[in-house]
Amino acid sequence: MGSSSDIVPDRSPADDVAPVTDTKIPKEEPLTLRRTRPSRACTVRAQQRLQELQAAERKLKPPKKEYKREQHRRREEVVEEDEDSEDDDQEDEENDGDDESNPKQCVAGGSSTKIITSLVPPPEPSQMPRWNLRSMWELASVLNFLHVFRPLLKINAEFSAEEFETALLTPNDTLSDIHIPLLKAIPPVTRMALTRDTWVTVLCRKIRDCWHWVAEGDLPIVALQGREIEVYKNLDPAIRVVILKALCDIRVEQEDIRSYIDNSLKTGVHLSVFRKDRVGGDSHGVNFWYEEDPLIGHRLYREIRKAEVLKVKTKGSKILPNITYQWETVATNFDEFQDVSEKLLQSSSRIEVSLGKKLVKDMLPEIEKEHKRKEKLLKKQHRQALLLDNFVVVDGLAGRSLRDRKPVRYTFDDYDKSINDAIKITKKKHPSPEHPLHRRESARLDALANGRSTSSTHPTEPVNDTASGRSSDFADYDDFDEHRDESLDRRRRQRPQRYSATDFVETVSDNEVEFQSDDDIYGEAVYDEEYLKKRKQKKLSSGSEGDEEKGDEEYKWDEDNAEYEEEEEEEEEEDSLSASEEDSDEPRRAKKMPRRETKLRSRSNDFRPGLRRSKRATRIDYQQYEFSDSDKEATGLAKRKRFVEPDEPSDETGNGDFTMGSQDSEENANDPETKSGEEEEPRDVNDNADTTNGKENNQLNKSNGTTDQEEVEGVVGKRRYLDLNELAPVSGFDDGPSTVLKDDDKTDNS
């Protein structure tokens, strides 16, 4: 190996200016003279290494044209981002000399460099504390922990990342809502209750023993008999973040979270759920992280690794480079994500361009949707705030005027007054224990049952077979007609079905409470027989002249029945006054109200218990007359009844005829058209039978007298009643006048 003089030329200025002399001083001789002992092998090797480095530095630089050509050729041939150190040094010198306004940063990483696009603008002075928080990777770790393990942490408070940062800068209730659930799940259980005022003390006690396991440095806060609360509020926000990060690390080591992670991985959950993977980066220490949380917010982070090597002359092994990390919060909202994506798409790095495309395609649509939802929520809150402001404003300026509140009363005067008014209103109304239709029908059926009067000394007479057969046919329709009559108005409903007297017979007791006065009697009133006899005699004596001229016996029967019709109309007016006014087509009749003294006297003088018969039973029976040839078919049925059972007593047929006749009379009383028709038809018959009027009147008076006398003595005689079902049809009267003869006269003539 040659000496150093052969490798390194002498560049001293004396070589060029001084004249050449003949004497030459050898250079190695003084060295050999000064050396007293040989150099060690390690010293020789170190000296040779230093000489080689100096020789490499002193190499002549190539010409400038050749340098540019070489640089241009290398730029065209570069496919990978990794380049040689010599080329990087040359590019560094050129970039430093060309322009200093390039927005790209060149970071040395070991033996290579990386171009990084600047994405975060310098913050404003007012936003500097928040920017310092966002530059801490511990804050991003805490937010990720809260997002992943939220179901187990039992943190009910909802907050965004910005609100969390505000709470770290200025402590508020959000910090207590986060720390209290975390402290409850960390053993040991403390005796002190965890509240908003005591959680700082519990925090100091629980992190005292575990601090050196999860953090570096000294414990920033200790329990000082309550003074630690003020100390915590005065801490730097970065220290509060470090304390919370240590608390999260302690919490993640608990059994519930570890079992949750193990069970999730066994069920097929990907590991990236618990260990965040980067969304982009290269092999030179630049990594991008994306946090997607619809509740806390979407965030994009960038981590830059810096490795610095100090150029110092050292002996021995190579010195390790000093590696540092720079953490940046690149984007926190929709607008920032749009700006970052545009910058990444314009970058010269292929990795940054691919990340920009990924942001635009996958992340921005979801972020935009969440941004619109939050905007709507903010607008709604703004409208509500405006409404509240308008309510607070003084009357007349904006909003509605305030309404006066009713004075508060702690007594029950108003309540008692309302109850008393309600009681008065209900008392004014007519009490109706049952439906009016039910009440009227029951009263009529009682009247029908009372028509078959029996004394206490005589047994009940048997009912005619034909009448009982008819009544049994209609017994099945009782329930049906009750419900149908409830829904129909009296003026509009159909004729009621016929009922048998045996179904509605009730004995009347002398001690009946409901019949204390005649005003309480509903339906048909049954008067005393003596009173009815006197009233009939008065009517016959007063109307004898008119009856002799007209000879209208049926009109007399209508006058006898006038009292029944008037009572019926009076009851209808009480039960359904409104319905009768709306539906009735006929004018009202003037009602004759019976005197109360007469009713009381007739009821108190002679009241018989049991079934009674009304005086309406003593009516003219048109079955005893014969009609014209066209009317014989209608009367043939009645004649057959008289000769079917001649051995039976005459009272049975009379009772059976009375049942049908009384029922038919009630049907016709309910129908105004039938009633008018009944009044007109007998008049036509009586006008055509003038020759027999005198005899009929005499026999009618005799029959009335005899029947009244028999009822007083308790003897039941033979009676004949009006049966409208056996009347001749209307067409028989239209054909022409027909002579009517009595059955007695016909038998005498025959």
UniProtKB/Swiss-Prot annotation:
Residues 133-192 form the DDT domain. GO terms for biological process: regulation of DNA-templated transcription. InterPro entries: DDT_dom, Rsf1-like. Residues 45-54 have a biased composition (Low complexity). Residues 1-125, 450-505, 532-750 are annotated as: Disordered. One of its GO terms (cellular component) is RSF complex. Residues 78-100, 545-585 have a biased composition (Acidic residues). Residues 55-77, 595-606, 741-750 have a biased composition (Basic and acidic residues). Keywords: Nucleus, Transcription, Transcription regulation. Residues 451-471, 688-707 have a biased composition (Polar residues). It comes from the Eukaryota. It is found in: Nucleus. The keyword Ribosomal protein does not apply. Interacts (via the DDT domain) with CHR11 (via C-terminus). Probable transcription regulator. This is DDT domain-containing protein DDR4. The gene is DDR4.
